[in-house]
Every structure is written in structure tokens, then in C-alpha cells.
UniProtKB/Swiss-Prot annotation:
Record bears the keyword Transmembrane: yes
Name of the gene this protein is made from: cobD
Localization terms from the record: Cell membrane
Protein known as: Cobalamin biosynthesis protein CobD
GO terms of biological process kind: cobalamin biosynthetic process
GO cellular component: plasma membrane
Similarity field: Belongs to the CobD/CbiB family.
Keyword Cell membrane: yes
Function in brief: Converts cobyric acid to cobinamide by the addition of aminopropanol on the F carboxylic group.
GO molecular function terms listed in the Swiss-Prot or TrEMBL record: ABC-type vitamin B12 transporter activity; threonine-phosphate decarboxylase activity
InterPro entries reported for this sequence: Cobalamin_biosynth_CobD/CbiB
Species of provenance: Chromobacterium violaceum (strain ATCC 12472 / DSM 30191 / JCM 1249 / CCUG 213 / NBRC 12614 / NCIMB 9131 / NCTC 9757 / MK)
Transmembrane segments: 61-81, 83-103, 152-172, 292-312
Membrane topology classification: Multi-pass membrane protein
Amino acid sequence: MNSALFLPIALLLDRLLGEPPRWHPLVGFGRLVKAVERAAYPAAPGAEPVWRMRLRGAAAIALLLAPFTLAAWALARLPLLEIIVPVALLYLAVGARSLAQHAEVVRKALAEGDLQLARERVGWIVSRDTRELDEAGVARATIESVLENGSDAVFAALFWFLVLGAPGAVLYRLANTLDAMWGYKNERYLHFGWAAARFDDMLNYLPARLTALTYLLLGHAAKGWRCWRTQAPTWYSPNAGPVMAAGAGALGVSLGGGARYHGQWKERPPLGCGPTPTHEDIGRAVRLVNRGMWLWAALSLAAAILIGAIHA
């Protein structure tokens, strides 16, 4: 059965239910990742040559990804589960409602003048230091997270579901989790996490650019395209650059700029064009992601119906 037919159902489940209230499968996967890391990691960083560290990391991600991807493929082929399994797995892979809820808490806190709460809660969704951010800094950090995670947590999962079905959604979500845990450029993970980071970059290459296209089509298209073309190449990430530059331009706000990470000030290129964002722009960013998500669902469903009619 065409995967596109399941996509609106899974998105409705996410909209109605959000993440599982008690236990998400990714929590268990994260524990497994830590166990595999303990077994696969050498005695200390730098104890082995670079190639061997990278090989260890590559073997670890293959060990973690292959069984779950194959299990999803097998379960989705069972006659009694061919609808339930794909819908359930895509529902678990997409985090649209969770992203919107986190952003809404920050938006509401800023709207009510509670800067301390806004700083605390934006710290849940970004890695930068948030304790000294002003209102504009909190709004900027939140919008950047919404735009980037809109690609990572929503559109990329939808893309791989449409391309490879349930196994694609599982493969992508688990690979993205591995990148979040191992894809750091520090002493411990620079080489061991190299394969996880590169694999995630590869999986996100096309989805990121389709996400950027979605943002500019649903916002200020000319501004979004200009920012994408001129600013994305300056950003530190080849996939986040197009997404955030196009999104900032589509919203007509200024993002990027310097930020403090783990006590160290990091200069970042500017993104977007327009005024400094406010709490109202957080809501606009969330709506941009949501409209894009349902646009993908509508286009996918229309394509599935058209293909079905042609082959009828």
C-alpha cells in the first residue's frame, strides 16, 4: 500500500496525542546507545589511530540501526499489520506537536513578561547558554530551534517515510538520535562519532533543501530565496544553513549572530532580513512549520491518488 496514504493519519495522531506520555521508544534506544558506546569505545580518547576510531563508530551505528530497520521492514509486510505498523512508526518518528508545545511555553512566558521562565524553558530545546539572554535573544533562539527542528523532527522523517516507508522513518529517526548523542566535535566524539555525523548529514541533505523550499513558498518567497542563496553558504552546517536562512527570510526576521555555548562565546553569521524577532514571531514560526507539514501531506496524498487512478 502507498506510504503517502498513511501520512495524514500519522500526523493526525501526533496532533491529537503528541508524544507518548509515559515512555517514548527513543528513550530506550538512547539507553541502548550508551550501552553500545561503553562496549565499543576504547580505553581513552586518542588511544587508537583515527581510522580505527572511525571504524569503531561506523560498526557501532550499523549494529544499532540495522536490526530495528529490518524489524520495521518485516513487521510492515505482515498482512494484519501493514497499516498499523507504518502509521504507528511514523507517529513515533514525527515530533511536530512536541516542538510546538515547547515553543508555545516560551512564547507565552515572554508575552506575560516572565523572562526568567522563558530563559529556563528555551534551554530545554537549545544547546546555547540561556541564563543571560534578553527577550530578543530568547525569541531568536526559540525560532532558530523551531526552524531547524522542523526539518530534523518533522520534514526529514516524512521524506524518508515517503521514500522507503516505515523502515525509512525508523532508519532516519534512529540515525538522527545517534547524531544527537555522538555527533559532537569534541575530544571524545570527534572520530568515534564521525560516521554518525556524516550519515546524518547524508540523510538530511535532500530533506533540508525541500524544507527550505517549503518555508520560502509559504512565507516571503523572494526574501527567503535571497537569504538562502547568500547566507546559507556562510553557516557552519551544510544542512541547517539552507533551512534557517530560508526560514528567517520567509518570516522576515533577523536570526543568527553571536551566542554563548558552554561558557564560550561563538560568533555566528547573520541569517534572515528584517527586525529583531519578538514573542509573536515564535508563533509565526510554529505556524510556518505546521502549514508546511500539512502541505506535504496534501501533496503526497494527491500524488498517491493520481498514481492510483493512472494504474487503475
